[in-house]
């Protein structure tokens, strides 16, 4: 099999890159081994929330110069701030065309409310997710937080208690309630099946939609704003929007314990657009080895195609980090298993020295989380110190940053993905 571009990994980075390449007329295939990190995400996307020093970021553009001084190995520092902002804005346009219902701007981060009642700075959030801006706009300062009877992946009382700890919400009235939803009685019999995805699947046929509407209105009481667990609408936000329109209330949804419906929706919509554009998905397959001709990758082999190689002009590594086996930790070293590429990390990290992989403080950022492949300003990778000109890396497989601690995982994914699409599109 021969393609213009082979993309290894079907998460946020791989699909974003694939969509951009298909729009340029390239023939792409995505080798997808299973669920991606986006299926477990909050649905909000971070561009840069915190500098390595711990300083909070409000204006990303102004903070990128300081980031380069503190972390010259960070992918943003390597690409340059103008490229980072340009590709972030390009993704905003892509998200709008996909109808992902995302709100936010590269101009300034906003604060979203987390399921535990915390406030987290972020770049883009679904418009159904509550933010500080949403709450401060409420005239009556009354919010009903509604859970679902028997559903333990969302805790209304804990959320309310923690929100009251924030000074801006100290005078707000948070009321607690629970929805019964008789349709879910079958799931309640087995707690392991009582998850957000199962709930959404049972409710999506709208067999008792009006009963659900009335139950929400009754449980909300006098409150005009309602927080719900993200359990309503599996493929997209249409079910939730219909629910909001029918109740006449300002409904908001918060992500639950994984799997996260908000992330799953985004994943499905990205994948649908890629396939609509003619892209090919090889699901349940995994790249296992590659063959080189000279200094370039010629072909790869997968678990399902060990005798029939897949060749292409360009290859994009979007396999993610340890979570999805894009990186593997052996006793002696951290390695990238398909191409055996050069590995880097943040300061003081050495991929061949286990003692540099962890921090003595459990809650501190762990150095191994910054491990990943080495890239240049075009996102081309290195092997044995030399650039592989037709092999690129995107997303969390890249080294040199702490995606969780610095709040930049999603941003690195889409910025590098669109950078690679630009590089490949401009070279052929």
UniProtKB/Swiss-Prot annotation:
This is Anaerobic glycerol-3-phosphate dehydrogenase subunit B. Its EC number is 1.1.5.3. Its cofactor is FMN. Keywords: Flavoprotein, FMN, Oxidoreductase. It comes from Actinobacillus pleuropneumoniae serotype 5b (strain L20). GO terms for cellular component: glycerol-3-phosphate dehydrogenase (FAD) complex. It catalyses: a quinone + sn-glycerol 3-phosphate = dihydroxyacetone phosphate + a quinol. Signal peptide: none annotated.
């Amino acid at each position: 099999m021969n393609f213009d571009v082979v993309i290894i990994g079907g998460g946020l980075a791989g699909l974003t890159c694939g969509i951009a390449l298909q729009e340029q007329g390239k023939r792409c295939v995505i080798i997808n081994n299973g669920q991606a990190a986006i299926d477990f995400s909050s649905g909000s996307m971070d561009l840069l929330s915190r500098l390595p020093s711990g300083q909070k970021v409000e204006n990303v553009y102004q903070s990128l110069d300081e980031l380069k001084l503190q972390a010259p190995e960070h992918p943003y520092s390597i690409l340059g701030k103008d490229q980072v902002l340009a590709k972030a804005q390009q993704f905003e346009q892509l998200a709008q065309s996909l109808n992902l219902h995302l709100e936010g701007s590269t101009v300034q981060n906003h604060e979203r409310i987390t399921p535990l009642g915390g406030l987290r700075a972020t770049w883009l959030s679904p418009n159904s997710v509550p933010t500080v801006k949403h709450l401060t706009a409420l005239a009556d300062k009354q919010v009903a937080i509604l859970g679902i009877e028997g559903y333990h992946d969302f805790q209304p009382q804990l959320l309310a208690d923690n929100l009251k700890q924030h000074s801006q919400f100290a005078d707000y009235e948070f009321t607690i309630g629970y929805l019964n939803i008789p349709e879910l009685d079958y799931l309640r019999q087995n707690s392991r099946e009582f998850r957000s995805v199962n709930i959404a699947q049972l409710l999506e046929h709208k067999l008792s939609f009006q009963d659900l509407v009335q139950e929400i209105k009754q449980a909300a009481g006098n409150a005009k704003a309602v927080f719900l667990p993200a359990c309503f609408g599996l493929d997209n936000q249409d079910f939730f929007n219909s629910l909001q329109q029918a109740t006449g209330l300002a409904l908001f949804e918060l992500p639950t314990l994984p799997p996260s419906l908000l992330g799953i929706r985004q994943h499905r919509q990205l994948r649908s657009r890629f396939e609509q554009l003619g892209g090919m998905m090889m699901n349940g397959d995994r790249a296992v080895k590659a063959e080189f001709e000279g200094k370039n990758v010629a072909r790869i082999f997968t678990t399902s195609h060990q005798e029939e190689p897949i060749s292409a002009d360009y290859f994009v590594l979007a396999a993610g980090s340890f979570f999805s086996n894009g990186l593997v930790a052996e006793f002696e070293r951290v390695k990238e298993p398909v191409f055996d590429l050069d590995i880097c990390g943040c300061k003081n990290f050495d991929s061949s020295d286990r003692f540099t992989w962890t921090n003595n403080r459990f809650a501190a950022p762990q150095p191994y989380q910054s491990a990943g492949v080495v890239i240049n300003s075009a996102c081309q990778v290195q092997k044995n110190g030399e650039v592989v000109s037709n092999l690129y890396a995107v997303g969390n497989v890249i080294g040199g940053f702490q995606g969780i601690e610095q709040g930049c995982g999603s941003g690195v994914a889409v910025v590098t993905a669109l950078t690679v699409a630009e590089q490949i599109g401009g070279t052929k």
